[in-house]
């Protein structure tokens, strides 16, 4: 028995592995936070409350540009418009060395899938972990200055998983005042400015299931110059849910 246990245990090495993986750059490999999917609590409730589908995937696309290690990702989470969003799927994505990549899966499959990190539909963004998915992607709020956030900023952070259901599977709502709006970890990326969705500039550090860290902020909810118009005037005629996400590996 002892021999079998010894053979089953890999020999530890003091040398860092300098290999690339599918979620980050070619850096020293970090310790994984989780490697196996866990059951999503309140699964029936999230399917109903979030209008999840098992027969369709998002038609939205993701476009990436990169400069000095910082990515700007335009994410189409329009889902057919505000009046049709509940009839359409969420868009799922993962952070990789090649940019933010779409994960083409349906909503109910995503409840058992660890390959995605982040999902969006209209003004709601959720992470793969806790009440939202089977993985362990967590978020910690940091300062509002994206450029000032570096690896030292991640010291002693408490990464929180999605926790928008009570033990009785009742939905916890955010502070927006919008009925049925869940208190997701990234919910404070926006606030009402007049009649539109204004961005707050809040920055988070996200911890992926691999242990890699990503600094993340929402630069815009609206396409083109719509966000600047909203933030400064309180209204905009530009299409919403055409996000611009800014992020970088730490």
Language model features with spans:
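Surface-exposed, beta-sheet-biased, low-hydrophobicity segments with strongly acidic/polar composition
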Residues: 16, 24-250
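Bacterial N-terminal signal peptides
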Residues: 1-6
């Amino acid at each position: 028995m002892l021999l079998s246990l010894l053979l089953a245990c890999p020999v530890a090495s003091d040398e860092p592995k300098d290999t690339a993986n599918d979620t980050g750059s070619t850096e020293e490999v970090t310790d994984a936070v989780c490697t196996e999917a866990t059951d999503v609590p309140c699964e029936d409730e999230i399917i109903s409350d979030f209008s999840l589908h098992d027969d369709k995937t998002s038609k939205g696309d993701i476009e990436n540009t990169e400069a000095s290690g910082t990515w700007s990702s335009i994410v189409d989470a329009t889902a057919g418009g505000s009046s049709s969003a509940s009839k359409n799927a969420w868009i799922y994505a993962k952070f990789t060395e090649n940019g933010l990549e779409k994960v083409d899966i349906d909503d109910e499959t995503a409840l058992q899938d660890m390959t995605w990190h982040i999902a969006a539909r209209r003004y709601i963004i959720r992470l793969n972990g806790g009440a939202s998915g089977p993985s362990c992607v967590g978020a910690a709020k940091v300062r509002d200055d994206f450029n000032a956030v570096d690896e030292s900023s991640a010291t002693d952070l408490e990464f929180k998983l999605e926790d928008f259901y009570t033990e009785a599977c009742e939905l916890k709502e955010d502070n927006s005042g919008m009925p049925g709006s869940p208190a997701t970890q990234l919910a404070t990326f926006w606030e009402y400015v007049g009649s539109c969705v204004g961005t707050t500039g809040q920055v988070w550090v996200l911890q992926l299931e691999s242990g890699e860290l990503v600094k993340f902020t929402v630069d815009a909810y609206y396409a083109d110059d719509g966000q600047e118009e909203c933030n400064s005037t309180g209204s905009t005629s530009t299409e919403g849910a055409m996000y611009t996400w800014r992020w970088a590996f730490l």
